[in-house]
């Protein structure tokens, strides 16, 4: 493994391959920006490839990210303390993502990509669930075709039309990294989930690879928007 002391390892983010993580992350962030998911520098994305983790920087306009802005970690690496994380590439004058320990939690579950968005629809459903079910409630919806875009769990295939999708919700914190414990607890309580909502904040979605994480994120956002409109029309999310 190349040590960052020997140079900034710029070769790790230099590739003509559009499927290289250093090229995919900027492309994903531009796509997410067009959906309104990562406005105002919010949100982020991370990809694991072999023993490297590629992460979008913090505090940067996501639609303007370039490959040379990407951080690279050696994997496995400690989540805490931040000083123990094994960065092998750090862009000059940029800050590591505050989402890093949450991304690492997803990779510990076998994910190949993790996405964090500030989707308005995700935020709205967390508020509606809190009002209708209280702070312990989770998001549930059934009998909607798009549910088929979400896995049942690792190695269990995809959900069906008649299944009830459940997404846990955790409370927001003042600092992003402080969400890690709650996220991990939700993962333990819902071992088949591929997403965790954060009340008044957004959502974390992960998948076995980039394509799966992206399409699952899109499917969930579709379902959240639909759920908000269904609620407005007085329609139940779960068909009895």
Swiss-Prot record:
SMART domains: Aldolase_II. It is found in: Cytoplasm. GO terms for molecular function: methylthioribulose 1-phosphate dehydratase activity; zinc ion binding. Catalyzes the dehydration of methylthioribulose-1-phosphate (MTRu-1-P) into 2,3-diketo-5-methylthiopentyl-1-phosphate (DK-MTP-1-P). Binds 1 zinc ion per subunit. Zn(2+) binds at residues 116, 118, 201. The gene is MDE1. SUPFAM superfamilies: AraD/HMP-PK domain-like. It catalyses: 5-(methylsulfanyl)-D-ribulose 1-phosphate = 5-methylsulfanyl-2,3-dioxopentyl phosphate + H2O. Its EC number is 4.2.1.109. This is Methylthioribulose-1-phosphate dehydratase. Transmembrane segments: none annotated. The active site is at 145 (proton donor/acceptor). Substrate binds at residue 99. Belongs to the aldolase class II family. MtnB subfamily. InterPro entries: Aldolase_II/adducin_N (IPR001303), Aldolase_II/adducin_N_sf (IPR036409), MethylthioRu-1-P_deHdtase_MtnB (IPR017714), Salvage_MtnB_euk (IPR027514). Keywords: Amino-acid biosynthesis, Cytoplasm, Lyase, Metal-binding, Methionine biosynthesis, Zinc. Its cofactor is Zn(2+). It comes from the Eukaryota.
């Amino acid at each position: 493994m190349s040590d960052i002391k020997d140079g900034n390892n710029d070769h790790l983010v230099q590739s003509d391959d559009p499927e290289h993580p250093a090229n995919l992350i900027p492309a994903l962030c531009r796509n997410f920006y067009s959906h309104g998911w990562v406005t105002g520098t919010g949100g982020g994305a991370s990809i694991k490839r072999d023993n490297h983790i590629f992460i979008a920087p913090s505090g940067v306009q996501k639609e303007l990210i370039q490959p040379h802005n990407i951080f690279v970690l050696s994997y496995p690496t400690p989540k805490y303390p931040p000083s123990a994380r094994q960065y092998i590439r750090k862009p000059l004058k940029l800050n590591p993502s505050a989402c890093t320990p949450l991304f690492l939690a997803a990779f510990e579950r076998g994910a190949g990509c993790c996405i964090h968005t500030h989707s308005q629809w995700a935020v709205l459903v967390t508020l509606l669930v809190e009002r209708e079910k209280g702070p312990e409630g989770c998001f549930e919806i059934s009998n909607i075709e798009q549910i088929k875009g979400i896995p049942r769990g690792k190695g269990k295939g995809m959900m069906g039309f008649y299944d009830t999708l459940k997404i846990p919700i955790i409370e927001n914190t003042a600092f992003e990294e402080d969400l890690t414990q709650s996220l991990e607890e939700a993962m333990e309580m819902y071992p088949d989930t591929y997403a965790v909502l954060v009340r008044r904040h957004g959502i974390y979605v992960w998948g076995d690879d980039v394509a799966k994480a992206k399409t699952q994120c899109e499917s969930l956002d579709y379902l959240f928007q639909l759920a908000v409109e269904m609620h407005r029309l007085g329609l139940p999310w779960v068909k009895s």
